[in-house]
Amino acid sequence: LFNARDQYLYYRTEDNLTSLGGFYLYTVLGPKLLEGVARPSLSDYDIAFVKTDYYGSLYQKTPYKEARADSLAIFQYTKTPRQYLVTKRQDGALKTYHTLYPLHLLDLGREMDIFVGGLSAVTTIQTNSPYKASLLVFGDKTALTFLPFLANQYSTVTLVDLFQLGSQEYESLSLLDYDQVLFAYSIETFMHYNTPSRANRLLTTLEE
């Protein structure tokens, strides 16, 4: 990210990476997880700005109102067409999308949830990819910025939010279903919310 620091990597009014920031994070993360996969290029994507006047949670919290609005961009993979099934589990309820970017949520005032439907206890992305590997991710909202890119290189990617995980969602998980496990947290979450011990307890139980 440092090498691309002059680009639009972070929102001005939201405490998260932009889609472009997520892409650059993926360019480093992807090759480490996936041997033999070609280095990603922006030319592999059709980029669309779906909202150009977004003011996020940081803007709402501060009395300073001179910040410029943010733009929300989606990256559609065009190198090889993909179909997606996104399944979200939360409080015993099940919701599905057939897209990585459910844009109808813009009309509901849930702008940041257009990225994989937002953060839920368990989010699973299934892709008709030629790659057969599966990935289990323990992460926070930062992971939502790069999952749309990683999803194209796996058959299944599951994101688990340890802080929303209930007993019903927990029962749907099995380490045996995945080839790799990734921990993807912002520094703030990792340092202030006792994430390692939560993850360790869950992994120990799942292995039993």
Show where each model-derived region lies:
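Extracellular glycan-modifying ectodomains
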Residues: 1-208
